[in-house]
Amino acid sequence: MTFIIFLFAGTLWATHKNEVSSMNEKRVGKRTIALSHPPSVISYANIGGRQEAEGPLSSYFDELSDDSFFGEKTWEKAESTMQKKVVQRALDQAKLKPGDLDYICAGDLLNQCIGSSFGLRDFGIPFYGLYGACSTMGESLSLAAMLIDGGYASRAAAVTSSHFCTAERQYRMPVPYGNQRPPTAQWTATAAGCTILADDGPGPYITHVTCGKIVDRGVSDANNMGAAMAPVSVKLTPSKYNAVCGLVSTHHSLQQGGAKGATVMGTHNTNHLK
């Protein structure tokens, strides 16, 4: 038995469950998938704004701008421009053309993913619009990796972006309003990143994908993003922390903590920094 589901502009084909081979051999535990054909990272690029240029991670950016509008007339258009720039840079570094990508998985923090959809429309690449807030980069990499592992794509791009001024208008107060920021307020990055995955390459490889779960601790302060994200640190063992936070962020935490008389050395997996 075969049936077809029409979902908006896309078409999803599904077959009777008896005709589909079991995927249980790919699952490890409750939320992790082991990829039998791990895709390789073949190119990546990123871009940041003025605050990022002044921050401790400035040397890790491929491109930095002191213009929060990136030559555009609105901040929303600026965010779209960032996405377009990073995808083109990643393509150029891999010596690829837009037509060489089978899919692009991208998202941002705006309604209807307008940062992604307007920024990437000229590429003409099959597009999955994602909304995972701060997890969008991980979500896009996960889905792109599974598309390639499943044999549905040879190359796919994972993209995300955020912009301080667009995020403030989306979630809190428009910047021109001049609202006073409370002590708990975080600063949303003005930045974008793109990673291109392929079914063949020198690595690094994405070998496993873990999907998180929704945790609601009742945090109602829209300014305090740190409190909303804190539960993940409680559940992680030290040896797994770097897989989520990243080596750069761990190194930065050590530097900042040491300067204030605190340390995470011995608490998290920091052997690579000794």
Label each residue range with its predicted role.
Residues M1-F8:
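Hydrophobic alpha-helical signal peptides and transmembrane signal-/tail-anchor segments
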Residues E52-E54, G115-S117, A167-R172, G257-K260:
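Short acidic, glycine/serine/threonine-rich loops at helix termini
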Residues M23-E76, P174-G246, G261-A262, G266-K274:
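Condensing-enzyme catalytic core mediating Claisen C-C bond formation in acyl metabolism
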Residues V41, W75-S135, N242-G257:
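Conserved beta-ketoacyl condensing-enzyme motif
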Residues I42, A106-G107, A156-S162:
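Short beta-strand segments
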Residues Q112-I114, F164-R169, K213-G218, Q255:
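Short, well-ordered, mixed-charge alpha-helical segments that flank or form enzyme active sites
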Residues Y131-A158, L197, P231:
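Active-site-proximal alpha-helical scaffold in enzymes
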